[in-house]
Amino acid sequence: ALGPHLLSRAAFDHLCAEQYTCVLWNAIPRDWEGDRNWVQRAIDLCAGQDWTLIVLHDLPTGAMQYLHEFLCRLEDNGFDIEQDFPPECLIVRNGVPDRDAEKYISG
């Protein structure tokens, strides 16, 4: 889950000072659980919002053996895969913080 535990103040200040961009996500299909069910959860998350940015975890759980299935189902359901991000997922852009960035900073 996203929240104030995500970034320390020092990390956030560094991102801004060095003019980095920080991208978050708006969909978590719980793929780390390692079962095939994450694919359907991810499809449901995509269907439930206009622009979905899913975080997937490259962990040794076996979940990524279903990645091809997930990508095929996205295509079969008419979803587009893009390399740009929903504006609400960019909390820092080229060092400039979004007005909601503070809610992700601890301390």
Language-model features and meaning:
Residues V96-G107:
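A short C-terminal boundary segment appended to hydrolase-like catalytic domains
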